[in-house]
């Protein structure tokens, strides 16, 4: 049985938003299980309240369709990434706004490539505990530790928020390539520098969010948890500012590794649903029923 997001699954022809499960985790280097993340988020989404009090609207009313999971080939990273890119392109060319659910973070590379081919140029907002700027990891350029190195070399402007693990070479590369870096420790000491983040981004933005950006006390179900992460409120405030000021062309949410802690899956589903609502308000697909709550 095909899983859906939330209580209502819009017919594909009527949907504005397509949720694309990408259950690929061939490149994980620590705890396994991210391939089960998309299914866990879809199952948890059944329990969400359709009306979001904070938004004053019900995001499901934009029309959300959950697509079939993208197939992948065990042991064949390059071929699997090609399949991800082609599946994303299919939905983008049909005029859908895409929210992809990983899977490990390597899936971001083919997803971003598909968005560029279909929609043109944009900047990247990468929210994560890890910089993911290794040229390769464990002998593979398709590692979940490498997607943003590859995207940097392909010319994408990059803004990274919430980072708390980064090696010397990655830091040197980030400085050389003009990456705008907003590490978690600075955010905790000084507050979320929204004006600086918005200034560093272009007019059009693709957002990639690794759930380990959140503190493990809130989000324990990730492959590589690190203390000192962002709060749910900080992440929501960041997303709200970006959606308010920029055109968000697409998103992915990655690296949920379900481990029996349902509150983490609910948190992930709620964050995805909130982001869909923000896009609905930005694009004029939704209107606030109630203001100033």
From Swiss-Prot:
Write the Enzyme Commission number(s) for this entry.
Answer: 3.5.3.24
Family the entry assigns: Belongs to the arginase family.
UniProt cross-references to CDD domains, sorted A to Z: Agmatinase-like_2
Which sites bind Mn(2+) 2?
128, 130, 210, 212
Question: Which PANTHER family is this protein grouped with?
Answer: ARGINASE/AGMATINASE, GUANIDINO ACID HYDROLASE, MITOCHONDRIAL
> Which Gene Ontology MF annotations are present?
agmatinase activity; aminopropylagmatine ureohydrolase activity; metal ion binding
Species lineage, top-down? Bacteria, Thermotogati, Deinococcota, Deinococci, Thermales
Additional facts recorded: The biosynthetic pathway, by which spermidine is synthesized from agmatine via N1-aminopropylagmatine has been characterized in the hyperthermophilic archaeon Pyrococcus kodakarensis and the thermophilic Gram-negative bacterium Thermus thermophilus.
Q: How is the cofactor bound?
A: Binds 2 manganese ions per subunit.
Q: In which pathway does it act?
A: Amine and polyamine biosynthesis; spermidine biosynthesis
* Requisite cofactors: Mn(2+)
Identify the Pfam families for this entry. Answer: Arginase
Keyword annotations from UniProtKB, A to Z:
Hydrolase, Manganese, Metal-binding, Polyamine biosynthesis, Spermidine biosynthesis
Q: What's an example GO BP annotation here?
A: spermidine biosynthetic process
What highest taxon heads this organism's lineage? Bacteria
Q: Where does Mn(2+) 1 bind?
A: 105, 128, 132, 210
Q: What is this protein called?
A: N(1)-aminopropylagmatine ureohydrolase
Decide whether keyword Nucleus is in the record: no
Q: Which residues form a coiled coil?
A: none
Asked whether the UniProt record includes Disulfide bond among its keywords, one would answer no
């Amino acid at each position: 049985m095909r899983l859906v997001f939330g209580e209502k699954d819009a017919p594909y022809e009527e949907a504005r938003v397509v949720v694309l499960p990408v259950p690929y985790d061939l490149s994980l280097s620590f705890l396994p299980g991210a391939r089960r993340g998309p299914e866990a988020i879809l199952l948890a989404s059944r329990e969400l309240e359709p009306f979001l009090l904070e938004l004053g609207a019900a995001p499901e009313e934009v029309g959300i369709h959950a697509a079939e999971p993208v197939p992948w080939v065990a042991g064949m990273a390059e071929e699997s990434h090609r399949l991800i890119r082609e599946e994303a392109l299919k939905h983008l060319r049909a005029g859908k706004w895409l929210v992809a659910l990983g899977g490990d973070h390597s899936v971001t590379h083919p997803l971003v490539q598909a968005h560029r081919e279909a929609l043109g140029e944009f900047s990247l907002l990468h929210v994560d505990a890890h910089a993911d700027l290794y040229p390769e990891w464990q002998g593979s350029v398709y590692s979940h530790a490498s997607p943003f190195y590859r995207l940097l070399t392909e010319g994408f402007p990059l803004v990274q928020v919430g980072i708390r693990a980064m090696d010397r070479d990655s830091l040197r590369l980030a400085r050389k390539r003009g990456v705008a870096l907003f590490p978690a420790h600075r955010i905790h000491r000084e507050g979320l520098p929204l004006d600086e983040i918005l200034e560093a981004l272009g007019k059009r933005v693709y957002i990639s969010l690794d759930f380990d950006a959140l503190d493990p006390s809130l989000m324990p179900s990730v492959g590589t948890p690190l203390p000192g992460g962002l709060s749910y409120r900080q992440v929501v405030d960041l997303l709200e500012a970006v959606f308010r000021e920029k055109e968000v062309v697409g998103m992915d949410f990655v690296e949920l590794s379900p481990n029996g802690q349902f509150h983490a899956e609910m948190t992930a589903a709620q964050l995805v649903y909130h982001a869909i609502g923000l896009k609905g308000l930005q694009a004029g697909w939704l209107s606030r029923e109630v203001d100033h709550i």
